[in-house]
Amino acid sequence: MTILNHTLGFPRVGLRRELKKAQESYWAGNSTREELLAVGRELRARHWDQQKQAGIDLLPVGDFAWYDHVLTTSLLLGNVPQRHQNNDGSVDIDTLFRIGRGRAPTGEPAAAAEMTKWFNTNYHYMVPEFVKGQQFKLTWTQLLEEVDEALALGHKVKPVLLGPITYLWLGKVKGEQFDRLSLLNDILPVYQQVLAELAKRGIEWVQIDEPALVLELPQAWLNAYKPAYDALQGQVKLLLTTYFEGVTPNLDTITALPVQGLHVDLVHGKDDVAELHKRLPSDWLLSAGLINGRNVWRADLTEKYAQIKDIVGKRDLWVASSCSLLHSPIDLSVETRLDAEVKSWFAFALQKCHELALLRDALNSGDTAALAEWSAPIQARRHSTRVHNPAVEKRLAAITAQDSQRANVYEVRAEAQRARFKLPAWPTTTIGSFPQTTEIRTLRLDFKKGNLDANNYRTGIAEHIKQAIVEQERLGLDVLVHGEAERNDMVEYFGEHLDGFVFTQNGWVQSYGSRCVKPPIVIGDVSRPAPITVEWAKYAQSLTDKPVKGMLTGPVTILCWSFPREDVSRETIAKQIALALRDEVADLEAAGIGIIQIDEPALREGLPLRRSDWDAYLQWGVEAFRINAAVAKDDTQIHTHMCYCEFNDIMDSIAALDADVITIETSRSDMELLESFEEFDYPNEIGPGVYDIHSPNVPSVEWIEALLKKAAKRIPAERLWVNPDCGLKTRGWPETRAALANMVQAAQNLRRG
């Protein structure tokens, strides 16, 4: 029984973000479709070759996507919303981009599909839309074309397909309500057709992703698995693939399925290998997800070997990444600025492939010398002084309940804030960032590269902040922001100014579409050596009589959008960050900043996948926010912002944050999200986002007014704010001005009644 290795997927964007650049060039009309397609082909060929060279036996095909793999699956099944369909019924790459972005080089613009987080990761998928009586047919053959590509290059391949039940679970019903699970029998024939096509190509194994099987699914959904997989069996071997959690609670459902193998995430799940071996059918292959696909840490391969060695030779076994390597940067070897000791603690996607090769070889041979050598740096890290800061650990241990309480309740604070700010009804504001123009990015880059001295850099940033204030005053906004010209990314910027973080040059991971992020890495205890945002906030406030918001990223979001340590709990990291940012709130307040926004867009996405684990997470997540904010005086207004959220199941915790104002992303869901605030009788102020900043389309005054009137039916108008869905960093100035002018006009119309 020779053990093989494989990955569940590989990063798509390219080491230098080639895919992003090609997408954006095509969208802007600066390159042709053929040029875009050529970049995709080149990246796929390179990535297959890199994995093969690193020692991977079975290469994933179908993990590449032009925007998102769930959207690719929608097109595969012919699930194209009516508003995005071509007149002749055809589907092309522009159809895909219109669903993702709301517009493309061809076709009519229309509202983009809703976007939400992929399970509990920082990747976003485009939510499939389902309507009653919908028809499905094999429409978009990208998967088959890419399999042909890989076979022509001589690779041993394993196609990757999002499973039918997870696909339905991830979608939403539009229009007349019905049970979307009822569509299962309509999509299964398309899956059968795809599997038949793969069988014709001589494919032995297909990785069929059903991560929904790690959730606490309703019984009806669990019951659907057996008939669905009965219909899919027989043409190729199916590797039922799960990740992000363990499968033990649903193992009875899984073991009844007519599949030939199971992949389990042995990093994030609590599954016991011996129990899995005992309960799985003896002729099933077990794919052991031993290498963390979601983090950047080098694995202790001696531990991984010990975890799996007892079942070697007792059943067919593969070793794999825990999930797709999509969530990891590509290659550590190009990081030239990382300190050698710190660099020795990391492994990116290609290094993780190498780890899988080392592990496979050791399991096949019994020789573990190479594993011990590889694991030495990560074992040495446990005692490094760069990891432990006794002062931080002491301060954390001394936290009391009082540290997470504002001095007075919201009603008392609101009165003090009204007296201080005297804002009109329907106050208008933005979420924080303004367009990051080429000039701003060039300025930061030149400074970073040493081509610009500190004085000239600061003069340049000050000029952009001044421009942002002038623009906002001209537009008539009520509460201003400084525009964040000095910030590259809302998490990276804070990480750069906090001890305990390190940064990469090329550690990019895909967030959605062409958007990539370069998450900081938490390597040790977190503290704040000096004020971070105070100087620029103070400068912006000096330019205007209107209030300017101080802008902070909250502790849970910094945690969730960074690569965390693996040697302490997430709670510990979040509270260390909260204490550091608490000092920032106090310093902003002392500098005369009266409104401070602490963004927590990631609070909900950090939820454990199983509801039974939620309470513990929410308790420390809320406490971290409150530790951060509680130092503020009564007449300092604390705002928070959240996006891509379903709130109804965590409203108690949202209210427990005790923010004076919460701004939320609601435009794509047509204000549906406000229902949960209404039902809960949310007591504080709310700014429901009135237009979707992820789309370049400019909303009309009438559209915004209609949304606000809809909002006022759910929330008393005196507690409503008017704002976009999210920051405006990725937009251009022309559409930003136009959209904000319409937003301000809508608010003024409502004030006049």
Swiss-Prot record:
Keywords assigned by UniProt?
Answer: Amino-acid biosynthesis, Metal-binding, Methionine biosynthesis, Methyltransferase, Repeat, Transferase, Zinc
- Which Gene3D superfamilies does the record match to this protein? 3.20.20.210
Sequence positions that bind 5-methyltetrahydropteroyltri-L-glutamate: R17, E18, L19, K20, K117, R515, C516, W561, E605
Q: How is the cofactor bound?
A: Binds 1 zinc ion per subunit.
- Whether Nucleotidyltransferase counts among this entry's keywords is no
Q: Binding positions for L-methionine?
A: I431, G432, S433, E484, D599
Per the record, the similarity remark reads: Belongs to the vitamin-B12 independent methionine synthase family.
What is the name of the protein in this document? 5-methyltetrahydropteroyltriglutamate--homocysteine methyltransferase
Q: Give the gene symbol.
A: metE
